[in-house]
Amino acid sequence: MVKASIVAALSFWLVGCSENRSSQCVKLIGVANQAVNSIEAVTAPSSADSIEALRKIAVVAEDTNKAMRDLSLTDGKLIEFRDRFTAMYEATSAATQSLIQSSSIKDTAASQKAYEDLKASTSQESPLVDEVNQYCNAGQ
């Protein structure tokens, strides 16, 4: 899973990156890992598709978005990655909120669109994590 990729990468770049870049990578990856852990905790139970689970996912996305925005980064590439993460979390939160709303009023078409939007936003995670890992491991 994505978490494993991020965690595995952590040990490699601690040695090879400059201290500044390395510490900023640790911050960015730490926030991303926390999001993965929180989402896994919500989706692990059998009720992962419940409205309550969707609400929790939306909160995790919003909280992670704020934590990402609050990161103090100076490395230009890491700032770009952070901005992409925040856009992804914003889209995930919005799609999840739409899915909750459309499900509560039993609007099948709107629910399907929200679901597609949610899939589109979350599909960005794996390639983005790969790019972050590659960048943070560069120079090994």
Placement of each model-derived feature along the sequence:
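C-terminal motif of bacterial Sec signal peptides marking the signal peptidase cleavage site
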Residues: W13-G16
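Bacterial N-terminal signal peptides that target proteins for export
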Residues: M1-I6
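Bacterial signal peptide processing site
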Residues: S18-N20
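Alpha-helical segments in soluble extracytoplasmic regions
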Residues: Q24-G139
